[in-house]
């Protein structure tokens, strides 16, 4: 899939149901495809039955290389969305983010593409992945857009990272790029 996906605009895969006793696909399959294909991956959670994906989009923004890659990859979807929101967490801890202007950079970038966004107030939470998923549910989000593995996978494995949490627990489809 990773090799064939390199010549695709978007790879769409389902996430393994971790409650299955003998899953057909390895639990880390979405992660593997994202890390090795060089293409955006749309991951659909098990049991997702809503009629829409991409009408109400939430971008998890931290000004990283992975984050802008995901946003750029999502532009065709964002142009058709009814609502695009940008959320940032712990902006005071991000070396590449000016806390006073947080979100204005990505809002301007998207405006150049004709996409109107709502920049949510910066959030503070030490469990970003869990907080992001909860906020997504509160906002009736039907697509999360985020960069995957801004830190090394080893660090995420040790500390429990946003990517790992979202990949493992999201009930909302996720578009990720690395």
Say what each PLM segment does.
Residues 1-87, 168-178:
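Intrinsically disordered or low-complexity boundary/linker segments at protein termini
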């Amino acid at each position: 899939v990773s090799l064939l996906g390199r010549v695709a605009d978007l790879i769409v895969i389902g996430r393994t149901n971790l409650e299955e006793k003998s899953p057909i696909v390895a639990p880390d399959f979405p992660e593997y495809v994202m890390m090795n294909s060089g293409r955006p991956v749309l991951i659909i959670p098990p049991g997702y039955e809503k009629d829409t994906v991409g009408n109400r989009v939430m971008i998890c923004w931290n000004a990283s290389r992975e984050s802008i890659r995901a946003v750029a990859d999502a532009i065709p979807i964002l142009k058709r969305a009814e609502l695009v929101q940008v959320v940032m967490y712990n902006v005071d801890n991000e070396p590449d983010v000016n806390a006073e202007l947080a979100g204005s950079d990505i809002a301007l970038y998207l405006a150049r593409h004709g996409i109107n966004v709502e920049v949510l107030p910066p959030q503070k939470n030490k469990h970003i992945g869990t907080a992001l998923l909860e906020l997504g549910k509160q906002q009736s989000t039907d697509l999360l857009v985020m960069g995957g593995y801004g830190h090394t996978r080893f660090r995420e494995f040790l500390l429990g990272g946003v990517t790992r949490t979202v990949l493992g627990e999201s009930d909302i489809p996720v578009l990720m790029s690395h």
